[in-house]
C-alpha cells in the first residue's frame, strides 16, 4: 500500500495551459541602443549575403589578379606550395569583404544625412571606422582602419547576441574572462622570435629518446 501511495504522487493533476501565467516578455524591458542603424540596415545586409551565397560558385570573374595573390602567399617562407583553388577563394573572400564593408559605411553615411563618400573627405574615415566598430566581425581591422575617437569612445559595441559591451572596451582586442564576460584588455607585449629554439627543442627531444 505504501508503494502504491508513493507511485500515485507522480500522477498529480497538472494545470492546463489556460491556467499558466504568460511567459515574461524580456524584449520589452530591454533598452534600445541610442545609435541604432536605419531600419533597412539588417534586411539589406541579409539580402546582400543571400545573393552572395547564391553566386558563390561563380568563380569565372575575379576582382583581384590571381597571380598577385599567389605571389603574396608565396612570400610567406612557411608556404611551400599554393593550390590553384586557394587564390580563387581568397579573391572571392576579399571581394565579399570589401563590398560588405562598403555597404555598411554607406549606410552610416545615409544615417548621418550625407549622400557622398569622397576619399579626400575626413568623413570617409569616420564612416569606415563606424562600420568596423559597430560590427563585431570587423574588430580585426582595428589596427588597420583609422579610428574615429568619437565613434570608439561614445558608441558602445554590439555583441552578436545583442548585448552591449562596456564603453571602456578597446575595439580590436576582444578579451573574455572565465565567465565569458568582456573585460578591458591587458597590455599586449610582443615577444621577438628567437631563432634556433625549435631546432634546439627538437634536438633535446631526439637526444632524450635516443638515450632511452
Swiss-Prot record:
Compositional bias, Polar residues, is annotated for: 1-10
Q: Which InterPro entries match?
A: CBFA_NFYB_domain (IPR003958), Histone-fold (IPR009072), Transcr_DNA_Rep_Reg (IPR050568)
List the coiled-coil residues. none
> Which lineage do the record's taxonomy fields give for this organism?
Eukaryota, Viridiplantae, Streptophyta, Embryophyta, Tracheophyta
Q: What is this protein called?
A: Nuclear transcription factor Y subunit C-7
Protein origin, superkingdom: Eukaryota
Keywords of the record: Activator, DNA-binding, Nucleus, Transcription, Transcription regulation
How does it associate, per the subunit comment? Answer: Heterotrimeric transcription factor composed of three components, NF-YA, NF-YB and NF-YC. NF-YB and NF-YC must interact and dimerize for NF-YA association and DNA binding.
- Asked if Ligase is a keyword of the record, the answer is no
Region Disordered: which residues? 1-23, 190-212
Similarity annotation: Belongs to the NFYC/HAP5 subunit family.
Question: From what organism does this protein derive?
Answer: Arabidopsis thaliana
Amino acid at each position: 500500500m505504501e508503494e502504491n501511495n508513493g507511485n500515485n504522487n507522480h500522477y498529480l493533476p497538472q494545470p492546463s495551459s489556460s491556467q499558466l501565467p504568460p511567459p515574461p516578455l524580456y524584449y520589452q524591458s530591454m533598452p534600445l541602443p541610442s545609435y541604432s542603424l536605419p531600419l533597412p540596415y539588417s534586411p539589406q545586409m541579409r539580402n546582400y549575403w543571400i545573393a552572395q551565397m547564391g553566386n558563390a560558385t561563380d568563380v569565372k570573374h575575379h576582382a583581384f589578379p590571381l597571380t598577385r595573390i599567389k605571389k603574396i602567399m608565396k612570400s610567406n617562407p612557411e608556404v611551400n606550395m599554393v593550390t590553384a583553388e586557394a587564390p580563387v577563394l581568397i579573391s572571392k573572400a576579399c571581394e565579399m569583404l570589401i563590398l560588405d564593408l562598403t555597404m555598411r559605411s554607406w549606410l552610416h553615411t545615409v544615417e548621418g544625412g550625407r549622400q557622398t563618400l569622397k576619399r579626400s573627405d575626413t568623413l570617409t574615415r569616420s564612416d569606415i571606422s563606424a562600420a568596423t566598430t559597430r560590427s563585431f566581425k570587423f574588430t580585426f581591422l582595428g589596427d588597420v582602419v583609422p579610428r574615429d575617437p568619437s565613434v570608439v569612445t561614445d558608441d558602445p559595441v554590439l555583441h552578436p547576441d545583442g548585448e552591449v559591451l562596456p564603453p571602456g572596451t578597446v575595439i580590436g582586442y576582444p578579451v573574455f574572462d572565465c565567465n565569458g564576460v568582456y573585460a578591458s584588455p591587458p597590455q599586449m607585449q610582443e615577444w621577438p622570435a628567437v631563432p634556433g629554439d625549435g631546432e634546439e627543442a627538437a634536438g633535446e627531444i631526439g637526444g632524450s629518446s635516443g638515450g632511452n
